[in-house]
C-alpha cells in the first residue's frame, strides 16, 4: 500500500493513522466511557483488532496474516497474537517448526505469570508474532479455574500482558480460535475492535450470531470494544443479493448495526493452497507469479511438469489491498470522531453554549 492510503498520519498521542476519505458505513460504537480497569493502559490498545467468528474455515487466519503482511510491507509496525491451538498462522507465515514457533509456550507463560508478552521479531520486516500452538491447551483449564475464583475479571489477563507492548505497534491483530470461547473471551476483553470474517453459507452466519451474543457480554467488561465490521471471505459472488443477506445477518446479530465492508475476498482455491504450502502471503505470491517464466518457456526448457503458481494470486492480493485501504480509512474516521467528541466534552460549559 503506497501513497496516502498506505502511510499513516501522526495523532496527538504519537500513533499513526491512515489518510483517505471517510467510508460511509459506520461501525458499532463502543459503550459510554467508563473508568478503565486498574493497571490496563487502554490507550495502548486502541489499534488492537480481534479477528473473531465461532465458525472455523471462514478466513480468520488468512485475513490476519495477509492484512498484517501488507501493512508491514507498507511501513507499518504490526504485531500478531495467535490464540489458536492449531497455529495455522505459523503455516501462513512460513515459520512452522522454526525458531519463532514455540507452540504457544511464551503466550501461556505470560498469561499465567502476568508478565508482558515477548513477541518474536522480524517474521517479516515490521511484522512480529506471539505464536500459538499446542501449549495453549493448558491455558483453557487455567482460565476456567480463574473465572471460578475471580469472575469475569479473569478475562482481562490478556489485556494486562498485551498493553505494555501494544503501544510499540501501529496495528495489533489477535487471531481467535473457533469454538474455544474462553480464549476468544480473552481477546474480546483486550481488543478495541472486532473484525469478523464470514462466508455467505449458513455455518459462517450462525458463528457470527454466536459472536454477537458474546460481544455484548464482553462490553460489560471492556466498554471500549466496538465492531469494526464484517468481511465476506472466499465468496464466488459479488451480487447485491448476497451482500444484502449477509448485511441483514450482521444487523440481526449486532442489534440493528450492519457494518459490512464493501471489499470481499474472492474464492481462489489454488492460490489458497499455494499460500499455505509455501508459507507465502498473497502479495508475495503475486510477485513470484510475475517472475515465473511463461508456461511455454518452461515447457521448452523441460520444466513442463513442475507445479506452477496460480495467476489468480494477483487478484486475491488486490482484494487484500482494497480491504486494507478500507480498514485504515474506517479506523481513521472513528479515531477522528472520538477525538472530536473528547474535545467537545472537555470544553468549558460557557464555551460550548452557542
What is each stretch, according to the model?
Residues 2-354:
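P-loop NTP-binding core
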Amino acid at each position: 500500500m503506497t501513497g496516502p492510503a498506505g502511510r499513516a498520519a501522526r495523532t496527538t498521542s504519537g500513533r499513526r493513522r491512515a489518510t483517505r476519505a471517510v467510508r460511509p458505513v459506520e461501525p458499532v460504537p463502543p459503550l459510554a466511557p467508563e473508568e478503565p480497569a486498574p493497571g490496563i493502559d487502554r490507550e495502548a490498545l486502541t489499534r488492537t483488532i480481534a479477528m473473531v467468528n465461532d465458525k472455523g474455515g471462514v478466513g480468520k487466519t488468512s485475513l490476519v496474516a495477509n492484512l498484517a503482511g501488507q501493512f508491514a510491507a507498507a511501513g507499518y509496525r504490526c504485531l500478531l497474537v495467535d490464540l489458536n491451538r492449531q497455529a495455522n498462522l505459523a503455516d501462513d507465515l512460513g515459520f512452522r517448526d522454526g525458531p519463532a514457533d514455540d507452540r504457544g509456550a511464551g503466550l501461556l507463560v505470560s498469561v499465567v505469570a502476568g508478565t508482558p508478552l515477548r513477541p518474536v521479531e522480524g517474521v517479516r520486516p515490521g511484522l512480529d508474532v506471539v505464536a500459538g500452538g499446542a501449549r495453549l491447551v493448558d491455558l483453557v483449564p487455567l482460565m476456567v479455574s480463574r473465572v471460578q475464583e475471580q469472575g469475569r475479571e479473569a478475562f482481562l489477563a490478556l489485556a494486562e500482558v498485551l498493553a505494555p507492548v501494544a503501544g510499540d505497534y501501529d496495528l495489533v491483530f489477535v487471531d481467535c480460535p473457533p469454538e474455544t470461547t474462553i480464549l476468544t473471551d480473552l481477546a474480546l476483553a483486550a481488543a478495541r475492535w472486532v473484525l469478523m470474517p464470514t462466508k455467505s453459507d449458513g455455518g459462517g452466519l450462525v458463528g457470527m450470531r454466536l459472536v454477537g451474543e458474546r460481544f455484548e457480554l464482553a462490553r460489560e467488561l471492556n466498554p471500549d470494544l466496538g465492531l469494526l465490521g464484517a468481511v465476506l471471505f472466499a465468496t464466488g459472488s459479488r451480487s447485491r443479493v448476497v451482500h444484502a443477506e449477509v448485511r441483514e445477518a450482521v444487523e440481526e446479530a449486532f442489534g440493528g448495526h450492519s457494518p459490512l465492508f464493501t471489499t470481499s475476498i474472492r474464492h481462489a482455491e489454488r492460490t489458497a493452497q499455494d499460500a499455505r504450502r509455501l508459507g507465502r502471503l498473497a502479495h508475495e505470491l503475486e510477485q513470484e507469479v510475475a517472475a515465473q517464466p511463461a508456461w511455454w518457456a518452461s515447457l521448452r526448457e523441460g520444466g513442463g511438469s513442475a507445479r506452477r503458481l496460480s495467476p489468480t494470486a494477483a487478484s486475491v492480493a488486490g482484494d487484500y489491498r482494497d480491504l486494507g485501504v478500507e480498514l485504515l480509512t474506517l479506523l481513521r474516521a472513528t479515531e477522528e470522531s472520538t477525538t472530536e467528541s473528547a474535545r467537545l466534552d472537555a470544553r468549558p460549559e460557557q464555551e460550548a453554549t452557542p
